Amino acid sequence: MEIDYLDKALDDIEFWKKTGDKVIQKRISKLLESISKTPYSGIGKPEPLKHQLSGYWSRRITEEHRIVYTVSSDRIKIISLRFHYT
């Protein structure tokens, strides 16, 4: 499935590149690959979000940070890659 990124998500990717944290960069890469193949299962403990974020999904990058995304029939939209559900 094709992946699109919101501007905030692109800013978050730049943030992670600037940190130089190769472990997190590699983790994000693996998570994005998994999301593109199996959006609702796989690594990172995928979970549907609730309340105001109903329809969104998240996966754990670290204890503190999550990837938040939505899935349509042919696309995945990455919303953010930092913090919890912001």
Can you say where each PLM-predicted feature lies in the sequence?
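Generic amphipathic, hydrophobic interface segment in small proteins and small subunits
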Residues: K30-G55
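Enriched for short, Lys/Arg-rich terminal
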Residues: E2-D4, K8-K26, K30, L49-K50, ...
